[in-house]
């Protein structure tokens, strides 16, 4: 693949016009075959990995020929696998061809995405999820409204293929992609749907589709805004495989589809900040309510016009930061006023003015987290700790390590909040749940378990926050860190509990719109 990338940099035209011959490279299928076996070995028993899982390149070439000639309304790869796996919906050869298809399409996509990123000026991107919070602290207090928009992940297969045609000139190379997409659409669980829904599974192909779709949406959006506003200060671009990124847009022009894009609404010097984590963009706006309504209307019309899909109104919600709390990745966000006393002493008299500054105040959602812990059987619905019965078959060290990992993730993620009383309540629940689990395993009580294991029981677990607070700073910085928030930036993804809580919030918003 590195050789393909080097060739693409030297001659990108060759990459776009002659992708189809890559499907007949045996090295490509050897790579996809090994990758498929590595992934499937972790989810299948060893008895399923027999010698019949050897790849036949002749069979692969026959399948590619059938892809080009078959009717797209027929499910792909029917009766093609001589030894289908009972626990897999896709056949062995279809997965191998799917891996090879992803490898081929990643070549021009990576070159195009890198060139778009390198061509931007004064743009910043961050991979860590926690770099979003310093940005919110810096930008959100200067805004009065936010738009919480969710990127639609439902799109018709043919529209997705046509978007690929914008930057891939080799039309035959898109036939396998079209067949795979229609194959997924014709699956039993999607027969009643008119559009394809990209599933949230950890496969390379669907991860590539999601990255491409998000990159395409954002690149078209920002390029359209830059072309419309005629402003050189408006940067645009896309960041695939990033957790989020942010933009500051100084000028924006909104087009109305009702008048066939003839009427132009000019928004003079609005302050708009854009940040995205996962598939949830947040747009902070400082302006009147009319500006917020125009931006919300523009996002809905943009998705309809370019991707021919109807986006439900609840997918773009507006909130007033000065009045209501907004839900960001696992937090309640609000802007609170912080009064400061400034003493100015002159020769005649003393002035004591009061300065009021705005700052972001993230609140830990304790009640939803307790509800999620109750779902995972760490406590009941009222927050009373219970034993984790499914872990009683593990060793004591494994039980302690698992509880320690849960608390470490929670403390790491929510350590930026001013009020940590809720965090210590979560710590208490996990601590007693750990002790009750060990007591249930040894058929004793918490007092007996603590007496047998001694004080090392709670020193080994739930002690990581001491390491986080005692950072290698100076004494003054260490004292200041006890009063200020510390955003830990070594978490690669959103906490699963925070992600689940965000889904619950989305369901509540949908129910409000349904009513």
Swiss-Prot record:
One GO cellular component, as annotated: chloroplast
Please verify whether the record's keywords include Chloroplast: yes
State the compartments where it is located.
Answer: Plastid, Chloroplast
Question: Its GO biological process terms?
Answer: mRNA processing; RNA splicing; tRNA processing
Source domain of life is Eukaryota
Q: Pfam families, per this entry? A: Intron_maturas2, MatK_N
Q: Which UniProt keywords apply?
A: Chloroplast, mRNA processing, Plastid, RNA-binding, tRNA processing
Entry-linked InterPro entries: Domain_X (IPR024937), Maturase_MatK (IPR002866), Maturase_MatK_N (IPR024942)
GO molecular function per UniProt: RNA binding
Give the family per the record. Belongs to the intron maturase 2 family. MatK subfamily.
Function field: Usually encoded in the trnK tRNA gene intron. Probably assists in splicing its own and other chloroplast group II introns.
What's the protein name? Maturase K
The source organism is Pinus densiflora (Japanese red pine)
Gene of this entry: matK
């Amino acid at each position: 693949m590195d050789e393909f990338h080097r060739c693409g940099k030297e001659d990108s035209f060759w990459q776009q016009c002659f992708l189809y011959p890559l499907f007949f490279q045996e090295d490509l299928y050897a790579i996809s075959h090994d990758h498929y076996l590595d992934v499937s070995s972790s989810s299948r028993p060893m008895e399923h990995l027999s010698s019949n899982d050897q790849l036949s390149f002749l069979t692969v070439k026959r399948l590619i020929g059938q892809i080009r000639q078959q009717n797209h309304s027929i499910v792909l790869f029917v009766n093609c696998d001589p030894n289908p796996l009972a626990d897999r919906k896709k056949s062995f050869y279809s997965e191998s061809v799917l891996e090879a298809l992803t490898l081929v399409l990643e070549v021009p996509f990576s070159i195009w995405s890198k060139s778009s990123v390198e061509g931007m000026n004064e743009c910043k991107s961050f991979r860590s999820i926690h770099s979003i919070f310093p940005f919110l602290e810096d930008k959100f207090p200067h805004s009065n409204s936010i738009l919480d928009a969710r990127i639609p992940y439902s799109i018709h297969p043919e529209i997705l293929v046509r978007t690929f045609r914008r930057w891939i000139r080799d039309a035959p190379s898109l036939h396998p992609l079209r067949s795979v997409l229609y194959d997924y659409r014709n699956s039993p669980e999607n027969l009643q749907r008119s559009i394809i829904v990209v599933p949230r599974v950890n496969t390379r192909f669907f991860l590539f589709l999601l990255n491409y779709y998000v990159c395409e949406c954002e690149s078209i959006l920002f390029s359209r805004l830059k072309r419309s506003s005629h402003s050189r200060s408006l940067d645009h671009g896309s960041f695939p495989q990033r957790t989020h990124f942010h933009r500051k847009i100084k000028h924006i022009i909104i087009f109305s589809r009702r008048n066939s894009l003839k009427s132009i609404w000019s928004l003079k010097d609005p302050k708009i900040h854009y940040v995205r984590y996962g598939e949830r963009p947040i747009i902070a706006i400082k302006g009147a309510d009319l500006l917020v309504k125009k931006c919300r209307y523009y996002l809905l019309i943009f998705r309809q016009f370019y991707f021919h899909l109807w986006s439900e109104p609840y997918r773009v919600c507006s909130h007033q930061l000065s009045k209501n709390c907004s839900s960001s990745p696992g937090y309640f966000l609000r802007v609170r006023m912080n009064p400061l006393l400034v003493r100015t002493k002159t020769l005649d008299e003393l002035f004591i003015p009061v300065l009021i500054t705005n700052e972001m105040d993230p609140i830990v959602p304790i009640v939803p987290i307790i509800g999620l812990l109750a779902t995972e059987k760490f406590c009941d619905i009222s927050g009373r700790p219970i034993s984790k019965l499914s872990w009683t078959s593990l060793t004591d060290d494994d039980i302690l390590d698992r509880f320690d990992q849960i608390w470490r993730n929670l403390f790491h993620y929510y350590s930026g909040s001013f009020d940590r009383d809720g965090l210590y309540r979560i710590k208490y629940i996990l601590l007693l749940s750990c002790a009750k689990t060990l007591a249930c395993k040894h058929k004793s009580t918490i007092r007996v378990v603590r007496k047998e294991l001694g004080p090392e029981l709670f020193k080994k677990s739930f002690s990581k926050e001491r390491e986080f607070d005692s950072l290698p700073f100076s004494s003054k910085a260490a004292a200041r860190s006890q009063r200020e928030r510390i955003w830990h930036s070594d978490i690669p993804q959103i906490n699963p509990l925070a992600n689940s809580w965000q889904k619950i919030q989305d369901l509540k918003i949908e129910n409000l719109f349904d009513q």
